């Protein structure tokens, strides 16, 4: 049986429309046990200012972003369950969901799945890797009962 530890940090001013901690755990349990038996993840929900600062420092981008992932790599031969941190910007998620006609809960789920896959080593910088990552995201989203996150939803 898999064991996941979630450290949920809410660092944004407005807490309305945020998914519950149980939902975040549910989404993590749909991804992480496919790859690991044990994992510890921090999910930090932030406002645009913090997202902007982290995106500028770590990616050299001058804008806030929906999700950032910071995998933890333990030095060899240390084996830890700490997988890393997922930073999600509440305002960007809400805005993008509305602009893309996405169901807000489904978009939150997609950000958690996307961020989790980054922690597990997946990326989308090379087309072949992007296709594999998108396939996994879509498969997991379908298991959750959500539509393909890369297609526009009709409201």
Swiss-Prot record:
Higher taxonomy: Bacteria, Pseudomonadati, Pseudomonadota, Gammaproteobacteria, Candidatus Palibaumannia
Q: How is the cofactor bound?
A: Binds 1 zinc ion.
Q: What Pfam families does the annotation carry? A: YbeY
Instruction: Give an example GO cellular component term for this record.
Output: cytoplasm
Q: Name one GO biological process term.
A: rRNA processing
Q: What does this protein do?
A: Single strand-specific metallo-endoribonuclease involved in late-stage 70S ribosome quality control and in maturation of the 3' terminus of the 16S rRNA.
Q: What is its EC number?
A: 3.1.-.-
Instruction: Cite the HAMAP family for this sequence.
Output: Endoribonucl_YbeY
The record's family statement is:
Belongs to the endoribonuclease YbeY family.
Required co-factor(s) are: Zn(2+)
Q: Which UniProt keywords apply?
A: Cytoplasm, Endonuclease, Hydrolase, Metal-binding, Nuclease, Ribosome biogenesis, rRNA processing, Zinc
Query: Its Gene Ontology molecular function terms?
Result: metalloendopeptidase activity; RNA endonuclease activity; zinc ion binding
Protein name (database record): Endoribonuclease YbeY
Binding residues for Zn(2+)? 114, 118, 124
Q: Name its cellular compartments.
A: Cytoplasm
């Amino acid at each position: 049986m898999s064991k996941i530890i979630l450290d949920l940090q809410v660092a944004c001013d407005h807490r309305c429309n945020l998914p519950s901690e149980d939902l975040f755990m549910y989404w993590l349990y749909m991804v992480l046990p496919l790859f690991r038996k044990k994992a510890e993840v921090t999910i930090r929900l932030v406002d645009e200012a913090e997202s902007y600062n982290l995106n500028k420092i770590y990616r050299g981008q001058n804008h806030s972003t929906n999700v950032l992932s910071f995998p933890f790599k333990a030095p060899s031969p240390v084996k830890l369950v700490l997988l890393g941190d997922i930073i999600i910007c509440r305002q960007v998620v809400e805005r993008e969901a509305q602009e893309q006609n996405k169901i807000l809960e489904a978009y939150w789920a997609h950000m958690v799945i996307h961020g989790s896959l980054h922690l597990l080593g997946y990326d989308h910088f090379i087309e072949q890797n992007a296709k594999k990552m998108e396939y996994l995201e879509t498969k997991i989203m379908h298991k959750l009962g959500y539509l393909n996150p890369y297609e526009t939803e009709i409201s």
